[in-house]
């Protein structure tokens, strides 16, 4: 795992709760992510990883993202 200050969603270990710090995707993609619940300060749980994808639980819903998009979501471990 990378250091907390530089961690992206794809780096989060399975089962870990993380807090979204900021998004670095294009504005229209960031807007859609926020609509899905991936907004700044939201707490997300990494449920499963595989085949270059990640499944997260956000707002009591499981959402699948590809690794490229998950690398655009910067997080820190939630306390």
Question: Where does each model-flagged region fall?
Answer:
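Amphipathic, hydrophobic secondary-structure cores in small proteins
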Residues: 14-70
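Extended boundary segments
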Residues: 1-11, 74-79
């Amino acid at each position: 795992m990378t250091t907390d200050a530089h961690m992206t969603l794809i780096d989060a270990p399975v089962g870990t709760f993380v807090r979204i710090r900021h998004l670095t995707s294009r504005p229209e993609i960031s807007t859609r992510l926020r609509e899905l619940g991936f907004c700044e300060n939201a707490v997300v749980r990494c449920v499963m990883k595989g085949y270059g994808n990640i499944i997260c639980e956000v707002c009591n819903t499981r959402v699948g993202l590809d690794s490229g998009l998950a690398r655009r979501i910067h997080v820190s471990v939630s306390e």
